[in-house]
A protein has these predicted regions:
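Mid-domain alpha/beta scaffold segments of enzyme catalytic cores
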Residues: 1-217
Length: 217
């Protein structure tokens, strides 16, 4: 597998295998040499969500699918009732635990509900909360609960600078070229860009393997 520098994107990278590309039940072209996650976004849940999730479960078993998601809870933009969002999210959690693949989480104004589900289901494997914009205190509390955060273009600089190096994860999401993000992060860290790329690639490998054993500090 190539070094992965982008833990979550909706676009195919120029160099196959360097980004984890989001697949959905409606978009699941598995091109060779790329790596993927698959999930049902809370904005896209339909009345027949069980059929949608059945497709997710099949795609998730492919060896090039390295993670489950993005999936989660959204109190702001999703028109789907929260009880349905929770039911769908629990199905993703079950898949993550069963297949031993980490979960990429979308969460908007629902952190308490997210943590409650993690506790009630006795989750053993780590999650990553993608597109994190919050402060360093909340990021630390999430880590203690077994949830990494990944930073996109709208990251909080205080969170970046406070974060232990071994937890730094970056993503382009829907914002195109991840190299722009690496340039900004390297400048804020006053670090060599290639060193930051190597660090994040190492951290992504550790995250993907962390279903075996991981301790959060």
């Amino acid at each position: 597998m190539s070094a992965v520098y982008d833990i979550h994107t909706h676009d195919f990278p120029e160099v196959p295998g360097t980004s984890i590309v989001q697949l959905t039940p409606a978009r699941y072209c598995l091109y060779p040499d790329h790596v993927y996650s698959v999930g049902l976004h809370p904005w896209d849940i339909e009345d027949d969500w069980r059929v949608q999730m059945a497709k997710v479960a099949v795609i998730a078993m492919h060896p090039h699918v390295l993670a489950i998601g993005e999936a989660g809870l959204d109190k702001k933009k999703s028109p789907v009732p929260m009880d349905v969002q929770k039911a769908v999210f629990r199905e993703h959690v079950k898949l993550s635990e069963m297949l031993h693949k980490p979960l990429i989480v979308h969460c908007v104004k629902a952190v308490d509900e997210l943590l409650a589900i993690r506790r009630e289901m006795g989750v053993k494997h780590p999650w990553v909360l993608h597109g994190y914009r919050g402060g360093p205190e909340q990021a630390e509390q999430l880590r203690k609960q077994g949830i990494y955060v990944s930073l996109g273009l709208e990251y909080n600089t205080d969170t970046l600078l406070d974060m232990p190096f071994k937890y730094l994860l970056l993503e382009s999401d829907t914002h195109g070229d991840v190299n722009v993000l690496y340039k900004l992060v390297s400048e804020d860290m006053e670090a060599n860009e290639q060193s930051v790329r190597s660090l994040v690639a190492k951290n992504i490998v550790a995250f993907l393997k962390s279903h075996d054993e991981h301790s959060f500090e």
